[in-house]
């Protein structure tokens, strides 16, 4: 019941913040140059066809009821799609509504995000502390693109509360171009800290839970997005010969959300290095993934076994924030067979 209360509180608040953040991000001028993609509905007749679309294109939405994926498609591939037998419907109005490049000024960059985190630590030293849990790829391999960043988290809670409290772990921005998610993570942390002692829900959460917030799990990628590119992945450019500057269809890096050790290389990931869903050369090949897995493992004792439901009293909750699809997803992503907990 406690977990359900936490989830309900969070989802309602999150929905409001995502709407506000997305609305703020939408307040940008109509572009003067054509966008680098065409928005189109790509229709599919099977799960295999959908997977091929996901692997080869930047899918923004999947409408299972009508059997299409809304995708950003490179203009020079539209004819080849149609020749291959794919039903394609181009949406010119929506295509022209998106900018060819640029970074919305309403979103903070990595430097701003780090400064806001530091401000919270300074303002509420009894309730929040920073934790360094690793390094970004560029931090270990600096080059002309930059020197990289330390990976940081905020740990929130009443220091006087008993040890062994359940964990609420919130992670944002593993996909760099999903710019609303770090803003939402910061807003969530700020609301808990500002509300402690006056707001019943915020006080209850910080008194009874450990709350860990990662504002950006992919700072290198975020910095690329700040330059106006549709970067999704991290900054590892050692595999493949990819487009530079990056495009939404062709970019260097590894999709950190496809690089985790568990069930690596299965449904929903790509083996092509320049694909936006490239999974990396091996499970947890990326330093960001390794750091995150070690950090989480140090906070949560795994009680999971394949094919066996989680114990009913499992208290911890991990949420990964994304600004794509308007979905609430739960494990597993590598199979269509429901989890034993469903």
Enumerate the predicted regions with their spans.
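Bacterial N-terminal signal peptides
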Residues: 9-20
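Bacterial N-terminal signal peptides that target proteins for export
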Residues: 1-11
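M14 metallocarboxypeptidase catalytic domain recognition
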Residues: 23-342
């Amino acid at each position: 019941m406690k977990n359900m209360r936490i989830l309900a509180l969070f989802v309602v608040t999150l929905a409001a913040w995502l709407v506000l953040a997305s609305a703020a991000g939408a307040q940008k001028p109509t572009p003067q140059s054509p966008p680098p993609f065409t928005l189109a509905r790509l229709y599919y007749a099977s799960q295999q066809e959908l997977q091929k679309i996901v692997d080869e294109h930047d899918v923004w939405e999947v409408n299972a009821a009508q059997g299409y994926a809304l995708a950003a498609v490179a203009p020079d591939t539209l004819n080849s799609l149609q020749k291959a037998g794919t039903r394609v419907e181009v949406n010119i109005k929506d295509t022209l509504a998106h900018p060819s490049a640029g970074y919305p000024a309403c979103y903070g960059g990595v430097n701003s995000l780090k400064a806001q985190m530091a401000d919270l630590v300074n303002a509420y030293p009894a309730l929040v502390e920073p934790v360094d849990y690793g390094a970004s790829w560029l931090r270990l391999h600096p080059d002309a693109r930059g020197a990289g960043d330390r990976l940081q988290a905020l740990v929130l809670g009443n220091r006087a509360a008993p040890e062994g409290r359940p964990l609420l772990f919130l992670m944002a921005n593993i996909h760099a171009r999903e710019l609303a998610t770090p803003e939402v993570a910061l807003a969530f942390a700020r609301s808990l800290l500002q509300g402690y002692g006056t707001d019943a829900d915020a006080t209850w959460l910080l008194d009874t839970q450990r709350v860990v917030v990662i504002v950006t799990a992919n700072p290198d990628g975020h910095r690329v997005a700040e330059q106006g590119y549709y970067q999704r992945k991290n900054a590892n450019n050692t595999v493949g010969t990819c487009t530079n500057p990056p495009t939404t269809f062709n970019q260097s890096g590894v999709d950190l959300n496809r690089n985790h050790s568990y069930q690596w290389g299965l449904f929903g990931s790509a083996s092509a290095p320049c694909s936006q869903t490239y999974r990396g050369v091996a499970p947890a090949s990326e330093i960001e993934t390794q750091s995150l897995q070690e950090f989480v493992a140090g906070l949560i004792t795994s009680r999971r076994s394949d094919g066996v439901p989680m114990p009913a009293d499992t208290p911890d909750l991990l949420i990964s924030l994304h600004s794509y699809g308007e979905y609430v997803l739960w494990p597993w992503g590598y199979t269509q067979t429901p989890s034993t907990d469903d």
